[in-house]
Swiss-Prot record:
This is Zinc finger protein 652-A. Belongs to the krueppel C2H2-type zinc-finger protein family. The keyword Repeat applies. Its main location: nucleus. Residues 80-255 are annotated as: Disordered. It comes from Xenopus laevis (African clawed frog). SMART domains: ZnF_C2H2. GO terms for biological process: regulation of transcription by RNA polymerase II. Residues 101-127, 167-186 have a biased composition (Acidic residues). SUPFAM superfamilies: beta-beta-alpha zinc fingers (SSF57667). A zinc finger (C2H2-type) spans 258-281, 285-307, 312-335, 342-364, 370-392, 398-420, 426-448, 454-476, 482-505. The gene is znf652-a. Gene3D superfamilies: Classic Zinc Finger (3.30.160.60).
């Protein structure tokens, strides 16, 4: 290592004059000690010396590039290697380097700093500069051509000059070699308008090679610069196309966009549109049952399985569905395999699906947007209006599949199906009780489980269903929401109103018949109705008037009527009237009012008003005669 350091020191001391000139000219390098520069004369003869090598080359020496500048100390250590060459070529390279010393002094200061950082790299660059290929450029102005060819490899004195064959070329080839060297290093200006190929570093060479095409020709823009003063005719430039106006563009777009009438596809040309129409829409797959059209056979088959027919059937109740998910919902809800996981936020009522919750939320709103056009009644849901409209139209959309009987409401069909099945649709497994609606079935099942989730807020009593709790709450509030249409009496429960109508308005006897006629009906042996009142005092008896006998043969043939009402004996027995009435009834006077406002029915189920009116008219006519 000591020998290596000494040899490097000597090599730096023997540095050529061009490097020393750079040191003198550059004020930034005045402080660098000269002990780092050595001449390389002693290192030329390397036959008897050995160095520590990193690679197989004879001049591969590892050396440190630590300099005096602080910015150079920051760089990392790098190993520089010299290309392996025969020893006899080293002397020629050195001589050429000394001859070119004057030209190297005129380089820029920036290049000097880069060369000082990398000393061995500078020597390699010098060797590369002398290895440049000879380029021959031939210019023919008559034919307006420019031919570029490469000469023999090697370093020659004539390599600095470019041979050109031009009629307008002036005699500039007589310049000195020194001028040629200066032209190489200082990038001279073009001579008489002709482009000169410059011999610089590798970057300049690559730039020139990019200017030259792969076939050895230079682009046309460089040849146009060669001809001046009308020596060669210029090529005509292609006139650029005028840009289309917006209206023209809109017209072209309208022409290009052709839309299919049967599908949303868009085409650029009419040919593609006609092809699309022939292939797609003229070979449509048509459903034989509903008439729908499909492009593909797979779409038609899927339509036949799902939408066209109800082919998906429930195994338990044989109900058919269009969609598979509808069957799943049916199995979960109807057959009791699902749980009510979704609850209403307002009333906490639970449902099977969230869709049912959304439908239920309408019940909490006061809006009734659906109004019947016939009677003006409003509803919250469209389905409620649809069911209500069946009352006006008389339509019966629900048909029994077993006997083809039709019904107006669905619950009626459920009740009817129990005839064919033998029991109602929902049957309790504990007690055997069956129900037509699942709502009632669920309420009944809570009686077996003991579940009573609905609690009264006033007394704390619990109930199995919400309607039962609401009915119980009326006992606390005193509310009576069920009024009687006849007498105006109000009731707390609907069953109480029903019982009130059955007891008070079910009268089967003719209430408007006079008592004299009732006596004749009870005792047919009496021919004169005045005989029935002979025991009354004379003061109150009016003068007798002859009355013709009534033909009551039809009345005698009537069967006896039942008397279920407890107050009906007041109208049939005459002694009750004699005790209360001071004046006996007169046959031609209107009958007394009934205890209750009702309509009497005869044995045929018709009103008795017409019969009584006929009797009154007949008696009045006989009196006038």
């Amino acid at each position: 290592m000591g020998q290596t350091a000494n040899s490097c020191q000597k090599m730096l001391d023997g540095r050529p004059a061009d490097v020393s000139g750079m040191v003198v000219n550059d004020p930034c390098l005045m402080n660098i000690p000269t002990s780092f520069y050595h001449s390389t004369n002693q290192e030329l003869d390397l036959s008897n010396k050995t160095f520590k090598r990193e690679v197989g080359g004879p001049f591969s020496v590892m050396m440190e590039n630590k300099m005096g500048k602080p910015h150079l100390l920051e760089t990392d250590q790098q190993n520089f290697f010299r290309d392996s060459k025969p020893i006899n070529e080293v002397h020629s390279v050195k001589g050429e380097r000394e001859n070119s010393g004057e030209s190297e002094e005129e380089e820029d200061d920036d290049d000097d700093d880069d060369d000082e950082d990398d000393e061995e790299g500078e020597e390699d660059e010098d060797e590369v500069n002398y290895k440049r290929e000879q380029i021959i450029v031939e210019v023919n102005l008559n034919n307006q051509t420019l031919n570029v060819s490469k000469g023999d490899k090697g370093v020659a004195q004539d390599s600095s000059h470019i041979k050109t064959s031009s009629d307008d070329e002036e005699g500039d080839s007589g310049e000195d070699d020194q001028d040629s060297h200066e032209d190489e290093e200082n990038n001279p200006l073009p001579l008489d308008g002709q482009t000169n190929m410059q011999h610089g570093n590798q970057d300049q060479k690559t730039e020139n090679s990019d200017m030259v095409g792969g076939d050895g020709t230079i682009p046309a823009n460089s040849t146009k610069e060669l001809g001046k003063g009308g020596e060669a005719p210029k090529r005509k430039k292609k006139t650029p196309k005028e840009p289309k106006s917006p209206s023209d563009k809109a017209k072209s777009e309208e022409k290009e966009t052709l839309t299919c009438d049967k599908c949303p596809r868009v085409f650029n040309t009419r040919w593609y549109l006609e092809k699309h129409m022939n292939v797609t829409h003229r070979r449509m797959q048509i459903c034989d049952k509903c008439g729908k059209k499909f492009v593909l056979e797979s779409e038609l088959s899927l339509h036949l399985q799902t939408d066209c027919e109800k082919n998906i059937q429930c195994i338990t109740c044989n109900k058919t569905f269009k969609k598979l998910w509808s069957l799943h919902e049916h199995i979960k809800i109807v057959h009791g395999y699902a749980e009510k996981k979704f609850s209403c936020e307002i009333c906490e009522k639970k449902f099977y699906t969230m869709a049912h919750v959304r439908k239920h939320l309408v019940a909490h709103t006061k809006d009734m947007p659906f109004t019947c056009e016939t009677c003006g009644k409003s509803f919250k849901r469209s389905m409620s209006l649809k069911v209500h409209s069946l009352q006006h139209s008389g339509e019966k959309p629900f048909r029994c599949e077993n006997c083809d009987e039709r019904f107006q409401y669905k619950y009626q069909l459920r009740s009817h199906m129990s005839i064919h099945i033998g029991h109602k649709q929902f049957m309790c497994q504990w007690c055997g009780k069956d129900f037509n609606m699942k709502q009632y079935f669920d309420e009944h099942m809570k009686t077996h489980t003991g579940e009573k989730p609905f609690i009264c807020e006033i007394c704390g009593k619990s109930f199995t269903s919400r309607p039962n709790m609401k009915r119980h709450r009326r006992t606390h509030t005193g509310e009576k929401p069920y009024p009687c249409d006849v007498c105006g009496m109000r009731f707390r429960f609907s069953n109480m109103l029903k019982a009130h109508k059955e007891k008070c308005f079910r009268v089967t006897s003719p209430v408007g018949v006079p008592p004299a006629l009732q006596i004749a009906l009870g005792n047919p042996t009496l021919s004169n109705p005045s005989q029935g009142v002979t025991h009354l005092p004379t003061a109150h008896v009016p003068p007798p008037s002859p009355t013709p006998p009534l033909n009551l043969n039809v009345l005698n043939t009537l069967p006896p009527r039942p008397i279920p009402h407890p107050f009906s004996h007041l109208h049939l027995h005459p002694h009750s009237h004699t005790h209360h009435l001071a004046v006996p009834p007169v046959p031609h006077l209107p009958p007394p009012p009934a205890l209750f406002k009702s309509e009497a029915l005869n044995h045929r189920g018709h009103n008795d008003d017409s019969f009584l009116r006929h009797l009154a008219e007949k008696t009045s006519a006989s009196q006038h005669h």
